Amino acid sequence: LGMIDIRPGQGTYISGNEANFFVIPLSWSLFMNGNQTESILEVRDLLEVKAAYLAADCVDDRALNRLYDVSHKIHQAYVEQNYKKFLDADLEFHSSIAECSGNTVIYSMLQTISNLMRHVSETGMIDGRQLQEIYEEHQKIYGLILAKDGEGAAEAMEEHMKRSKVRYNYR
């Protein structure tokens, strides 16, 4: 399950990744308890908003550079109107914000939820208008994070999450 690290010839150790102590049981619980889409989305919303808030205080150059790179990928995919590239970059965008939050538990939980939700989405984006909306929402969030406006980034992320539920027909 990732909570114990077995090293042949050396012994058995408790994993150094403390985030696994939360994430692995969460993954199994969600998997075993069937369809909990609404509950998962509520937790995702809370984590995404908090991650955006914390990301505004990010001082990790590597994480900030990744966020920049992903924002550039989103821009390129938008210009090309390449839906697949855009959706892949969308997942990376949210992941990089979680990384910028500096909270490994938030990051790990959002990765787990993202993997679960990838299989739950009933429709994806269906038109260029939605692509533009998401692009503009991401640009706003990214700009507020760069401006070190945690409150603004959190509000923009909250609005983005609300709109995403409608776009992806989550119920």
Question: What is the meaning of each model-derived region?
Answer:
Residues L1-L47, Y53:
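Short linear motifs at protein or domain termini
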Residues I40-E122, E136-L144, G152-R163:
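Conserved amphipathic alpha-helical segments that form helical-bundle/coiled-coil interaction surfaces
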Residues N65, R129-Q132:
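Short helix-capping and inter-helix turn/linker motifs at the boundaries of alpha-helical repeat units
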Residues Q81, I126-R129:
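Structural signature of alpha-solenoid helical repeat scaffolds
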Residues K162-R171:
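Short arginine-rich
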